[in-house]
Amino acid sequence: MRELTYVARRTAEWREAPDPVLQSDSDAIVAPVAAAPCDVDSAILAGHGPIPPPFAIGHECVARVVDAGESSRFSPGNLVVVPWAISCGTCDRCAGGLTTHCTSVPHMAMFGAPIGGSWGGLFSDLVRIPWADAMLVPLPGGLDPMAMASASDNWPLAWRLVAPHLRARPGARVLVIARGSIGLYVCDIARALGASDVLYVDPDPAHRAIAEGYGARTAAEIEPVHHGFDLAVESTGRVPELVTALRSLAPEGFCESAGNHFRPGELPLLEMYLTGVTLRVARDNVRAHLPQALELAASGQVDPGRVVSGVFDWEQLPEVLPERHLKPVFVRADQPVGR
């Protein structure tokens, strides 16, 4: 089989690799049918990753099961979402919902970067899934795999960034400072779940147009809005934008940072203390809440497909992926996306 391999800044190529095989009765082998890059893939291709090349990349896809171990509930032909992080489903952390911190594998075990072991990437023709019953989630009927290619990471991450807060604070005012798909998904979800106001901040006019289609107000940039928002979501990876988000919170407000902060910076800690700000900077435990996020996607209240910026053939991955796109989706001619 082939796997898309990151080899240098803005450069990826197909490389041959052995076909994966079942290593236990709980494994599955899947073939991605619709895959997309996330913010981490973009950072890696831009040369910001912590691991030097070469390595297989990609950690967002909807896939079709092609083989499964005897103890697995999955069968060949099933359409499934593959979470980006490796998790066993039974250790204390997995049982507590901390699936990104599974103790059965090395810290940071994931698809798309050999940080906690080598698990391959989801831009590969075939992928072995350990603990398939714990990891894989069936794609609900009626959902388009192309629209949900980011259900491995960015879509359920966006759900987690806003849905629990709106449950705790119905009608909350939401500020989103972003540069792409995560922030746009947040706008869609926030409006669907009853946010009274959503302001999306992004210098890209095309991104702002999508946010406006979701019912958000938009701006290219802002100064801090004193006590303006109950929840702020930052997904730029830029500390100045994070500071703006923090300084815009109302008393006892919450800031979720989903940016990959590769550069250091200072935070306004005294202001945060005086306002009563809670800041969370974290990788997402996707598998724990993926079923809830997919349930919302299947409800018809949201439209994640609007964020898809183009659909491309699988063979175009080496040429198209290094280019700057909002959310390109790559599909396989040999693995139809239909059920």
Regions found by a protein language model. Name each.
Residues 90-177:
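NAD(P)H dinucleotide-binding glycine-rich loop of Rossmann-like/cofactor-binding domains
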Residues 79, 138-221:
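Mid-domain Rossmann-like dinucleotide-binding core that forms the NAD(H)/NADP(H) cofactor-binding site
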Residues 1-3, 287-339:
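C-terminal hydrophobic helical "lid"/dimerization subdomain
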Residues 1-62, 124-127, 131, 333-339:
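Short N-terminal strand-loop motif that marks the start
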